């Protein structure tokens, strides 16, 4: 499976903890991420991660393009719902493209754990 990993700044440490917990599962899949999320994962795990631009610089749109062309099967997008994001339209577009292409997307840990435990 091809999995995209994205996290807002206030969720990056939590995502890293989640990824470390399931590193043995994620290691068998192809991973991509926005730049700073991917760098954090690469520096703190043994996982290989293809990195796109940071979200505000177009990374969300790059991953959206990968979804639209059939190159992503799952998205883990841990959003910070309590902090306004300057690139909110890009985030909305990414979630929309997931819906258009019927791509499962986890925006919180409960959903992410269900996906990992039941599908991956």
UniProtKB/Swiss-Prot annotation:
Chain ranges of the MGS-like domain: 1-120
Chain's gene name: mgsA
GO biological process, alphabetically ordered: methylglyoxal biosynthetic process
Keywords, alphabetical: Lyase
Database matches in NCBIfam families: MGSA, PRK05234.1
Binding annotation for substrate: 8, 12, 54-55, 87
Name of protein: Methylglyoxal synthase
PROSITE patterns assigned to the protein according to its UniProt record, in alphabetical order: METHYLGLYOXAL_SYNTH, MGS
InterPro entries found in the cross-reference section: Methylgl_synth (IPR004363), Methylglyoxal_synth_AS (IPR018148), MGS-like_dom (IPR011607), MGS-like_dom_sf (IPR036914)
Catalyzed reactions per annotation: dihydroxyacetone phosphate = methylglyoxal + phosphate
Protein family per UniProt: Belongs to the methylglyoxal synthase family.
HAMAP family xref list: Methylglyoxal_synth
Cellular component terms (Gene Ontology): cytosol
SMART domains, per the entry: MGS
Role noted for this protein: Catalyzes the formation of methylglyoxal from dihydroxyacetone phosphate.
EC number(s) from the headed UniProt entry: 4.2.3.3
UniProt GO molecular function: methylglyoxal synthase activity
UniProt-annotated catalytic positions: 60
């Amino acid at each position: 499976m091809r999995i995209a990993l994205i996290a807002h700044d206030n969720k990056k440490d939590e995502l890293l903890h989640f990824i470390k917990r399931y590193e043995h599962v994620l290691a068998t899949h192809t991973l991509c991420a926005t730049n700073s999320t991917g760098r954090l994962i690469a520096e703190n795990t043994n996982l290989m991660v293809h990195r796109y631009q940071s979200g505000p610089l177009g990374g969300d749109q790059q991953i959206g393009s990968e979804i639209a062309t059939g190159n992503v099967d799952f998205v883990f997008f841990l959003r910070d719902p309590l902090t306004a994001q300057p690139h909110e339209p890009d985030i909305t577009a990414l979630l929309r493209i997931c819906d258009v292409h019927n791509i499962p997307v986890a925006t919180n840990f409960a959903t992410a754990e269900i996906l990992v435990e039941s599908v991956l």
